[in-house]
């Protein structure tokens, strides 16, 4: 398979010069021999020791494994969780340099913190995120801001190369070519009530997602989460 970015004239000139790139070689007997095989993921519950006095933690999963359908409203919920609840609880109260929740398309939901002085307090606050979202009562201006920030990210102009990468990803992932537009429409139509209805699923994600940590030895040792500790420096 090949991907090309350019005008129709450049496209024709490219193939005239490149030939078939060997893409037609073989009779199918070797099909799949050199294919990338991704192993089935499993939770190793690992904490990797690095030279640091802080940590970087993530709790993430593929929501499809939990039977959760991630629509555009999830992006708005991610903004609300990141810039309201998690910011106040983990950044302000907990002292982490940064934190957030992301809903990347339909295939990843993730809590994360970085430059975090402690593991367990942040995990506990992640586990309470769904409860907070379930009682979410924003004022109109704040809620509109969450929506605008989501949609503006989708509407930002991109250069041809970036657009090609986006389309390649859509094709290789087997996504609907119109999924991006549909997701944008769902963002604009999101309501506070719809976000509240996601609270129970956020609680499930926090409870059932694997956790991985990179951090200093002392920070990891203070955690009671029972990590399998891996020393990256031997």
Features from the language model and the residues they span:
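In a subset of proteins, long, contiguous C-terminal domains/tails are tracked
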Residues: 189-234
């Amino acid at each position: 398979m090949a991907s090309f970015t350019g005008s129709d004239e450049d496209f024709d000139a490219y193939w005239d010069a490149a030939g078939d790139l060997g893409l037609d070689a073989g009779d199918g007997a070797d099909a799949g021999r050199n294919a990338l095989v991704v192993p089935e993921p499993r939770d190793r519950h690992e904490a990797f020791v690095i030279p640091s006095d802080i940590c970087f933690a993530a709790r993430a999963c593929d929501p499809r494994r939990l039977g959760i359908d991630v629509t555009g409203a999830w992006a708005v919920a991610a903004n609300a969780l990141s810039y309201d609840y998690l910011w106040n609880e983990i950044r302000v109260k907990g002292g982490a340099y940064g934190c957030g929740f992301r809903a990347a398309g339909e295939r990843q939901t993730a809590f994360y913190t970085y430059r975090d002085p402690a593991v367990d307090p942040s995990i506990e606050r992640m586990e309470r995120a769904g409860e907070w979202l379930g009682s979410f009562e924003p004022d109109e201006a704040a809620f509109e801001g969450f929506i605008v920030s989501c949609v503006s990210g989708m509407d930002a102009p991109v250069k041809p190369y970036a657009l090609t990468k986006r389309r390649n990803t859509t094709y290789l992932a087997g996504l609907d070519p119109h999924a991006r537009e549909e997701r944008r429409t769902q963002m604009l139509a999101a309501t506070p009530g719809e976000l509240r209805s996601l609270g129970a699923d956020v609680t499930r994600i926090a409870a059932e997602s694997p956790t991985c940590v990179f951090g200093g030895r002392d920070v990891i040792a203070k955690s009671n989460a029972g990590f399998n500790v891996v020393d990256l420096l031997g």
